[in-house]
């Protein structure tokens, strides 16, 4: 059965009518920088819902390190495992946060290779929101890792002489520190050729920094040349600030130094990452 030309003409709107239909009503306002950032923050948080397996790494890895070093090596590093726990728990919180920052680079690089990056570049919103929202979403990872690690430490016998405020203060300082470090791996995620390169390179950089710090043992037990590296390592200052806050002996110097280092990392790597992101070859 065929349709007559007259019927086609009567059901096909003319160009003027089509423009009227499409232009009816007000267009939505362009997203502000804040709303665009919050949207990408929500997108990052939804990753936990759709990929809950990542919670295994976030929760289990710090707990495994805490149990392993406390009960396998604690007696050798200190007079007893209980004494070593008082030293190591504030340090392992630094390790937990810093290890989570690698997810920033791998998730960003995955978006680039899946084409999500190209789609975002064509949309009319504040482009830095893509990075800022993702990095703010990673704060949830830090909170989960810190909360579970500290909770287990308290169950094992850790004494937080700084009280609740000291523990919360240490967690806030480490969240700021982790946020600043995540910009480094965000820059790496933009330039890396594949997600595996991001994680591989990150481990090569992170493990020497973590182990050549005062997270695991006192610097006095190390050779002189290594002590100089430990003293200059930002991980050491973060661990010291965490210990002082949790044990109620915090001074301005170490906490202020960690915050200054964090501000410096953001000041350097945030603009660099944005520049690399804008100039990224769409191919």
UniProtKB/Swiss-Prot annotation:
Top-level taxon: Bacteria
Spans within the Extracellular topological domain: 73-87, 139-141, 189-199, 261-262
GO MF annotation: an example: ABC-type transporter activity
Start and end residues of each ABC transmembrane type-2 domain: 53-280
Record field: transmembrane: 54-72, 88-106, 120-138, 142-159, 170-188, 200-218, 242-260, 263-280
Topology, Cytoplasmic side: 1-53, 107-119, 160-169, 219-241, 281-283
UniProt GO cellular component terms: ATP-binding cassette (ABC) transporter complex; plasma membrane
Record membrane topology: Multi-pass membrane protein
Pfam family, one: ABC2_membrane
Any one GO BP annotation for this protein: response to antibiotic
Compartments where located: Cell membrane
Keyword entries, A-Z: Antibiotic resistance, Cell membrane, Membrane, Transmembrane, Transmembrane helix, Transport
Assembly, per entry: The complex is composed of two ATP-binding proteins (DrrA) and two transmembrane proteins (DrrB).
Protein family per UniProt: Belongs to the ABC-2 integral membrane protein family.
Cited PANTHER family: DOXORUBICIN RESISTANCE ABC TRANSPORTER PERMEASE PROTEIN DRRB, TRANSPORT PERMEASE YVFS-RELATED
General function of this protein: Part of the ABC transporter complex DrrAB involved in daunorubicin and doxorubicin resistance. Probably responsible for the translocation of the substrate across the membrane.
Protein name listed in UniProt: Daunorubicin/doxorubicin resistance ABC transporter permease protein DrrB
Annotated source species: Streptomyces peucetius
Gene: drrB
